[in-house]
């Protein structure tokens, strides 16, 4: 940048003293120092912002790399699952086809009787319909209290008076 040694700075100070005079020199020096400080702060802010942007850019690239790796893993898993599912379906269909042929050779006329015996037991495994009343009764009491309509409505002043300690209440006078 600037190559200012001690001798050059002393020369600039002497010239400034001669040109500006002793009355205005301190004020000009303060102003110059303040401007120099502002310039340094501005440069430091710019440096910090540039370094933050560089870090953010590095984080963005790491994020995209991670997302692409996750997508690759996901597609690999899905492909493997589809492949195994296809193999299982092919095996299942070949086994069911063999059962249907055997049942057809035995003289069955309907396709309903050719179904495997385990299909009849699926009705027992079907999920039962849930009772609506049981679900309604499962709500906590505090929730029921908070959501129901209020039957005893009080004004704000009455509510404050109701919950105010006895020591803070005004004494009541009866005439």
From Swiss-Prot:
Compartment(s) of residence: Cell inner membrane
Keyword Ion transport: no
Keyword vocabulary terms for this entry: Cell inner membrane, Cell membrane, Membrane, Protein transport, Translocation, Transmembrane, Transmembrane helix, Transport
Gene3D superfamilies with a match to the protein in the record: 1.20.5.3310
Transmembrane portions of the chain: 1-21
UniProt feature coiled coil, ranges: none
Membrane topology designation: Single-pass membrane protein
Stretch forming the signal peptide: none
UniProt-listed InterPro entries: TatA/B/E, TatB
A family per Pfam: TatA_B_E
Gene Ontology CC terms, in alphabetical order: TAT protein transport complex
Protein's GO biological process: protein transport by the Tat complex
Keyword Cell membrane among UniProt keywords: yes
Ranges where the record places region Disordered: 155-175
One GO MF term: protein transmembrane transporter activity
Free-text function comment from the UniProt entry: Part of the twin-arginine translocation (Tat) system that transports large folded proteins containing a characteristic twin-arginine motif in their signal peptide across membranes. Together with TatC, TatB is part of a receptor directly interacting with Tat signal peptides. TatB may form an oligomeric binding site that transiently accommodates folded Tat precursor proteins before their translocation.
PANTHER family according to UniProt: SEC-INDEPENDENT PROTEIN TRANSLOCASE PROTEIN TATA, CHLOROPLASTIC
Subunit structure: The Tat system comprises two distinct complexes: a TatABC complex, containing multiple copies of TatA, TatB and TatC subunits, and a separate TatA complex, containing only TatA subunits. Substrates initially bind to the TatABC complex, which probably triggers association of the separate TatA complex to form the active translocon.
Protein family per UniProt: Belongs to the TatB family.
Name of the protein in its database record: Sec-independent protein translocase protein TatB
Organism: Burkholderia lata (strain ATCC 17760 / DSM 23089 / LMG 22485 / NCIMB 9086 / R18194 / 383)
Gene behind this protein: tatB
